[in-house]
Amino acid sequence: MLPGVGSDIADPDQTEMAYVQTPVVCLLSLDSALRELTLYLHDVTMPLLLMNAPQDHVVPPSNSEILATAARGPVERVSLDRSYHVATLDYDRSLIEEKVVDFAERVTKG
């Protein structure tokens, strides 16, 4: 077991429920799945909305660059500059809601 990862939130008034420990087998499974998934990123042709926090302490922000570069559809990026990993509970939560609703409305217009 490894120490758990949780509450990577800039807003001190917010907390996230998280496991105290992370089983190593879960991380190995995730790594294996991500390696396989990466082989198919070039098949993504639909519009993408990628949001990431430059100060994320859990997932490197560069991971979104991998997807943005590999995907063949249009990519819209939003930087969540005031938040950490759990951005939906953090300072940028209203921005996330606004951008997701706007994106969904635009891409579903027929």
Region locations from a protein language model:
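Active-site rim beta-loop-alpha module in soluble metabolic enzymes
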Residues: 14-17, 46
